[in-house]
Amino acid sequence: QNWVDQDRQSEFQVGDLDEFSGGEVRGLRFGGVGTLNFDKPWVWTIFGATHAFDEGFDAVESDEYTLFDLRLDIPIWEKTSFSIGKQKEPISMERLMALGHGPMQERAAVSDALLPSRNVGVVMAGTFADDRMTLAGGAFNNWLDKDQPNSFDDNATQYVGRATWVPYLSNNESTLLHVGGGLRYTNSKEGFVTQARPEFNQAPDFLATDFFFPEDSMTYQGEASLRSGPLWLHGEYVRTDLDSREFSDPTLDGYHITASWILTGEVRPYNERVGIFRPIPVARTVTQNGWGAWEVGARYSTMDMSEAPGSTIGADAGEMDVWSLGLNWWLTPYMNFNVNYRYITLDRFA
């Protein structure tokens, strides 16, 4: 459910948003996880959705069935695995965490615009240094996915890697510092186009590039997190450099800073195998005559696409800042209610 208010300058840039006020059923998701019981069990994952809206420059919007994950995880060594199939690329904590597990209803604009949703490929991942470090790398080409060109060579190929480190962990493990970074290269055979909504789903694109063909592109990503008891601070920076003489090698970048405080005192656990944070463990659910878990959050995000050609004549792709506040009520680990407020500024006609 959205309630939207805008000024005249906003109407001039993106049109009247009254039609985007209201509610929608975003999607019905379903799937399963199981094992093939060898000496070292293989894990299979299948998840999909109907009427699903999956954001990102290489994701597909469809009213039909959308396959999110079709993955097989094969253990190689004790703390190293090999994954094959349609899966998340190993880059960015915000992208690797499930959307519903974060403090905000939507990811930051830069994450959806410059980082992919899912892709078809292979990934090798493992943990090191007493589970204080993770390394993951993969190669991807989505020629087997729906609505893609028919041959492997006609599709863009990506090489993606991520490394994380926990340089500090307190004796009682309540305080933890996480740092990480990732790289993503693509040969851009399918061209480049991207867009970003103002961090609410039922909205038009506020930022949008034109479609063009760079020689290739490189994305750099960095992240840092501090968790101290119920407090969690997280930030990420993402930058994409496009090799395009026609448009003077444009750079697109942005960052976000997020703060979360769990009012009921739960501590968000850390998944050392992947280098991400897990969902809030509800200490006492409403089914146990408790109050569930309550969380407040705040985020600032910024996205700059102004060096890229815009999708509208006479405009560049735009710059956007978003200030957000959120309140989450987890009744159980599987059910929550939340409300978000956004204040958005946009410049597309600099």
Question: Locations of the language-model features?
Answer:
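Outer membrane beta-barrel
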Residues: Q1-D5, G15-K189, T251-Q288, A293-A308
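Surface-exposed beta-strand-turn/loop segments characteristic
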Residues: Q9-Q13
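Outer-membrane beta-barrel pore domains
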Residues: D16-L17, T175, L183, E190-A350
